[in-house]
Amino acid sequence: GSEMCIRDSHCSFSWASEENTDFIDTHFSTVQWCISSEGLYYSVNKKGARAYGGAWGGTSSTYHHNLFAHCNSRTPLMNGARGKDPGQDIVVYMEYINNVNYNWGSQMATYGGMDESQDPEHHGWSCNFVNNYYKPGPATTARVKELKFFRQSSAREPNKAPLRAVSKWYFHGNVMEGNSQLTSDNWEGVYTDGNYPYSIDEMKASSFIIPSGKENYEQYWFDWESYTLSDQYESAEKAYQSVLADKSGAGAFPRDKVDARIVKEVKSGLCTYTGAGDANSGAIPVSYTHLRA
């Protein structure tokens, strides 16, 4: 944690035993045009089934035009303002814009936002979740009972780290392919876990969130107007096309065989591999056996 001024662009991450990518407790970071795909379902991880896309967070961070594909969960886990250990965030401001999520396999695939920092300088958690494209795949259809964009989580350890405040969200323009209700009203696709003490209405921001607290928190100050995507983003449908574009989309170029296959599967709505004991998931089993869906 505590790394500063990070930019990951046109990278490809796959086949990890925990999360494919971790960008948490960072300051002034951008992750753009990257692919996170095919996490290992059952591998060397003693915790059991994983296949996680990533844990993303950080103070003043932007995530745009990235692709999650064939990951069971954490697509992404949005890391909270924890502030429990040295280097952890006491404030989180995120822009999560124009990303594509395909074939997730867990009901709470995108979740997080815990605002639990006990630091006296705690300053809250906020996110602009705008114009992202969700496309259910074979694993989603088989395993997810109710489609959702996001689940707001409570504290990791409720008895030790109670929530300090409600996390603030601006949900706008997100598309759930095949579901007109969630597409027209994004907040219908947001829910909370059973321990969260705040209501959905309390989470809502009515317009694009602008970071606050510059005067009191100089270490988190940045020239927001120069770096924000608030007036530069595409529609979710256009972002879907941009992310999957053959010569200018997400991933490292020229795309290798893995990334080329991943993009083809997103377009076709199919998958190649199955997680161990889980038909049509898209996740990679520990044996790496080539199983056709």
What kind of region is each of these model predictions?
Residues R7-W15, H27-K46, Y52-M78, R82-S106, ...:
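Right-handed parallel beta-helix
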Residues G275, N280-A283:
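Eukaryotic acidic, serine/proline-rich intrinsically disordered low-complexity regions
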Residues L77, R82, I90-C271:
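Extracellular beta-rich repeat passengers
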